[in-house]
């Protein structure tokens, strides 16, 4: 019976299958097979035994049920796997299973295989999010909207700017994921304290050959574990990615507020229900889910950092933690990437509300432009600031437009014509270098994809 939400509610099939118990078992068997192959090639174990171990290192022969049955007695998962594999091997080949290895050689190296596959899935979705954001930036480079600081109307900006800023950040997250992957996905076959003592003089050759067979980079040095700064970095990168998605979703949620309603999630009025009691509700539930799950992913960072300081050459305190945080962090990050794609690919714009919000303050958002233009025409900057500020305060107090108040101020109108003022008060023409900035991101993105 499914209990955890990642089993039935949060997750994608392509990521769940990586972390399913049978696939994890197969990856551990793959490591045992690579060990036997390397030892057979180097003459450490008989070539016939190595071939038999490689042939039987499959869940076709070593079943999850049998491993679990043995573990009920041994209370040790890898010892149970070794016994289950050995009993499937013909002749005396089973006697050579796991020779020279320690349990964590199998665990850490198989985890690297799982994480490599997970990163591939994550990278594909991150790249797709980047592509969608770049397309939105291109399509909306001229869609002027109000920019907000401190929750208040500030200056005009464009939706193209919003999307381009997010695209640039997603690109940095891709770079971080690639960089940490190089350090994280390593092979290890170095024995109980990292010295390869049980393998004799060929120890380092076995270590390197196992990694080569599995397509991994051999770890340079280790004790009984690959050092957990790599795993902590990976979880922090996932938390960072989740936080970027959180930021995007949070902005969309805020822009979907009733009093703003500039953009919003797609809502199916024929089928979708917003509230069990309020028939009118159309809630941003997907964006809210992204934000909620991002909080969970960030919480894994503490556990990942706590897993780095272990006793001496190794203790087991990291193991139980990583059985939870590694699959869950991968599954949940992948899931909210999928949700982000759903939101962005179906984003609805409300142009009339965007225009309404640009005009909401009665021109107060153009105060900076007015001040700057007065300064360019000869009024001192401080004097211009004070004069425009007085007009803005008067407009706010009386509910009149800034334009109407300014028209009555001769000390300002001495520098302007009415036509000048009309142009100054047009928010559509006060977006600075926004268009060029978006174009720069679009041009630079040709190197990213």
Swiss-Prot record:
PROSITE patterns: FUMARATE_LYASES (PS00163). Its EC number is 4.3.2.2. One of its GO terms (molecular function) is N6-(1,2-dicarboxyethyl)AMP AMP-lyase (fumarate-forming) activity. N(6)-(1,2-dicarboxyethyl)-AMP binds at residues 9-10, 75-77, 102-103, 224, 276, 281-283, 320-324. InterPro entries: AdenyloSucc_lyase_C, Fumarase/histidase_N, Fumarate_lyase_CS, Fumarate_lyase_fam, Fumarate_lyase_N, L-Aspartase-like, Pur_lyase. Pfam families: ADSL_C (PF10397), Lyase_1 (PF00206). The keyword Cytoplasm does not apply. It catalyses: N(6)-(1,2-dicarboxyethyl)-AMP = fumarate + AMP; (2S)-2-[5-amino-1-(5-phospho-beta-D-ribosyl)imidazole-4-carboxamido]succinate = 5-amino-1-(5-phospho-beta-D-ribosyl)imidazole-4-carboxamide + fumarate. SUPFAM superfamilies: L-aspartase-like. It comes from the Archaea. GO terms for biological process: 'de novo' AMP biosynthetic process; 'de novo' IMP biosynthetic process. Pathway: Purine metabolism; AMP biosynthesis via de novo pathway; AMP from IMP: step 2/2; Purine metabolism; IMP biosynthesis via de novo pathway; 5-amino-1-(5-phospho-D-ribosyl)imidazole-4-carboxamide from 5-amino-1-(5-phospho-D-ribosyl)imidazole-4-carboxylate: step 2/2. The active site is at residues 150, 275. Catalyzes two reactions in de novo purine nucleotide biosynthesis. Catalyzes the breakdown of 5-aminoimidazole- (N-succinylocarboxamide) ribotide (SAICAR or 2-[5-amino-1-(5-phospho-beta-D-ribosyl)imidazole-4-carboxamido]succinate) to 5-aminoimidazole-4-carboxamide ribotide (AICAR or 5-amino-1-(5-phospho-beta-D-ribosyl)imidazole-4-carboxamide) and fumarate, and of adenylosuccinate (ADS or N(6)-(1,2-dicarboxyethyl)-AMP) to adenosine monophosphate (AMP) and fumarate. This is Adenylosuccinate lyase. The lineage of its organism: Archaea, Methanobacteriati, Methanobacteriota, Methanomada group, Methanobacteria.
């Amino acid at each position: 019976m499914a209990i955890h939400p990642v089993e039935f509610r949060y997750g994608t099939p392509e990521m769940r299958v990586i972390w399913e118990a049978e696939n994890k078992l197969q990856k551990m068997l793959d490591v045992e097979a690579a060990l036997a192959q390397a030892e057979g090639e180097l003459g450490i174990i008989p070539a016939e035994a190595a071939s038999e171990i490689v042939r039987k290192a499959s869940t076709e022969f070593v079943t999850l049920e049998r491993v679990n049955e043995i573990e009920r007695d041994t209370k040790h998962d890898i010892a149970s796997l070794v016994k289950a594999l050995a009993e499937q091997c013909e002749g005396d080949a089973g006697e050579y299973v796991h020779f020279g290895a320690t349990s964590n050689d199998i665990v850490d190296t198989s985890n690297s295989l799982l994480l490599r596959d997970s990163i591939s899935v994550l990278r594909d979705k991150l790249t797709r999010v980047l592509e969608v954001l770049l397309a939105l930036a291109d399509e909306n480079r001229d869609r002027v909207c109000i920019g907000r600081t401190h929750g208040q109307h500030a200056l005009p900006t464009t939706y193209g700017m919003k999307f381009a800023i997010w695209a640039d950040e997603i690109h940095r997250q891709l770079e971080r994921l690639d960089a940490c992957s190089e350090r994280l996905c390593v092979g290890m076959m170095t024995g109980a304290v990292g010295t390869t003592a049980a393998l004799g003089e060929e120890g380092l050759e076995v270590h390197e050959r196992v990694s080569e067979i599995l397509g991994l980079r051999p770890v340079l040095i280790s004790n009984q574990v690959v050092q957990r700064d790599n795993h902590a970095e990976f979880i922090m990168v996932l938390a960072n990615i989740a936080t970027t998605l959180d930021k995007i979703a949070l902005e969309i949620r805020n822009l979907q507020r009733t009093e703003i309603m500039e953009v919003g999630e797609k809502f199916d009025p024929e089928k979708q229900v917003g509230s069990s009691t309020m028939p009118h509700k159309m809630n941003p539930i997907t964006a809210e889910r992204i934000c909620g799950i991002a909080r969970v992913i960030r919480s894994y960072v503490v556990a990942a950092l706590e897993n780095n300081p272990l006793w001496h050459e190794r203790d087991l305190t990291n193991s139980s933690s990583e059985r939870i945080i590694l699959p869950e962090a991968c599954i949940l990050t992948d899931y909210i990437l999928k949700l982000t794609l759903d939101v962005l690919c179906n984003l609805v714009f409300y142009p009339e509300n965007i225009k309404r919000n640009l005009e909401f303050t009665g021109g107060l958002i153009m105060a900076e432009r007015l001040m700057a233009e007065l300064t360019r025409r000869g009024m001192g900057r401080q004097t211009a600031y004070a004069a425009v500020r007085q007009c803005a305060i008067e407009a706010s107090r009386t509910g009149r437009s800034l334009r109407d108040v300014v028209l009555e101020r001769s000390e300002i109108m001495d520098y302007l014509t009415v036509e000048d003022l009309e142009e100054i008060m047009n928010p559509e023409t006060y977006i600075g270098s926004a268009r060029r900035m978006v174009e720069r991101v679009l041009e630079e993105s040709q190197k990213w994809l």
